[in-house]
C-alpha cells in the first residue's frame, strides 16, 4: 500500500497507528464493514436485527443469504444459495477469524455477473507459489506452510472444498464449501486467499503470533474513510451500470426477427 501524501485530510487530525500484516491468511478477522458495506452498496438487503447481530444480508433476487454470527459455535460466516435453474443448492461456512479481505473475495463475487471463462480454483494459488500435493485429496499448501486448500473426497462419495490456516497456537480458521458451490466463487476465494498484498489492522488487533510480519504505518482517519468510501463507490457504480443496462435493454420478442438470435446469446 502506498504511503498517503502528508497533509491529506482535515487539519488537526491525529494520525493513528496501524499495521500492515502479512501473510494475510494469518491477519485475523478484521472490520465486518469491509464486507457488509460493499453488499449494501451493491443493492443487497440488510435483514439484520436492530442490534446488528447476527448480520443477515439477502441478494436482490433473494436466492442467496449471507449471515455472520460470532456467538454461535463455531461462529462466523454462513452463506447459502438456493437451487435455481441448473444450479443446485449450495452452502459455505467461513470461520470468524477468516480475514474479511478473504471473505470479501467470495462475497464480492456474488454481486457481479459470472465470467464466461471456465473457473480454475487452483490457478490463483499456483500462480503465487502454493505447492500442490497429490494424494487421496488434492491439497495446495501456502509457501509458509500455514494455510492450505483441499478438495476433500471422503467415504461414501462425500466431497467438499476445505481451506484452513494455523499458527503456533493451533488452528486459526477454516472454511468449507459444498461441492455444489459455484466454482467461480471458490476461485474468487482462492484468489483473495493467495493475494500477496498485506492487509491493514489497527493497533491492538494484530493476532499474537510470531508467524506474521508487520509494518507500522501512521494513518489519518480521513485516509481510512477515503479508502473505505472508494470501495463503496465502486460497488455503487457497478450496480448502477448493471441496473441501467437492464432497464434500457430492448425486450425480447419471441415472434420478432431477433427471436433466434436472442435465444442464442451466452449468459454471463
Language-model region placement:
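Compositionally biased accessory segments in Actinobacterial proteins
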Residues: 1-268
Amino acid at each position: 500500500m502506498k504511503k498517503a501524501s502528508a497533509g491529506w485530510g482535515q487539519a488537526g487530525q491525529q494520525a493513528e497507528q496501524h499495521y500492515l500484516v502479512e501473510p494475510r491468511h494469518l491477519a485475523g478477522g478484521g472490520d465486518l464493514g469491509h464486507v457488509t458495506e460493499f453488499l449494501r452498496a451493491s443493492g443487497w438487503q440488510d435483514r439484520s436485527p436492530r442490534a446488528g447481530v447476527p448480520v443477515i444480508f439477502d441478494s436482490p433476487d433473494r436466492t442467496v443469504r449471507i449471515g455472520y454470527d460470532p456467538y454461535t459455535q463455531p461462529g462466523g460466516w454462513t452463506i447459502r444459495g438456493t437451487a435455481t435453474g441448473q444450479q443446485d443448492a449450495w452452502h459455505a461456512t467461513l470461520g470468524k477469524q477468516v480475514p474479511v479481505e478473504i471473505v470479501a473475495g467470495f462475497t464480492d463475487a456474488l454481486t457481479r455477473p459470472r465470467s464466461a471463462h471456465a473457473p480454475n480454483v487452483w490457478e490463483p494459488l499456483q500462480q503465487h507459489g502454493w505447492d500442490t500435493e497429490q494424494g487421496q485429496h488434492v491439497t495446495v499448501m501456502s509457501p509458509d506452510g500455514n494455510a492450505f486448500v483441499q478438495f476433500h473426497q471422503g467415504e461414501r462419495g462425500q466431497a467438499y472444498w476445505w481451506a484452513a490456516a494455523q499458527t503456533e497456537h493451533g488452528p486459526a480458521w477454516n472454511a468449507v464449501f459444498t461441492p455444489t458451490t459455484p466454482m467461480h466463487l471458490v476461485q474468487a476465494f482462492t484468489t483473495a486467499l493467495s493475494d500477496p498484498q498485506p492487509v491493514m489492522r489497527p493497533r491492538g488487533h494484530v493476532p499474537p503470533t510470531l508467524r506474521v510480519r508487520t509494518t507500522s504505518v501512521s494513518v489519518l482517519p480521513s485516509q481510512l474513510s477515503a479508502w473505505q468510501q472508494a470501495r463503496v463507490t465502486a460497488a455503487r457504480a457497478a450496480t448502477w451500470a448493471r441496473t441501467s443496462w437492464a432497464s434500457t435493454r430492448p425486450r425480447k420478442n419471441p415472434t420478432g426477427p431477433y427471436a433466434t438470435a436472442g435465444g442464442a446469446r451466452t449468459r454471463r
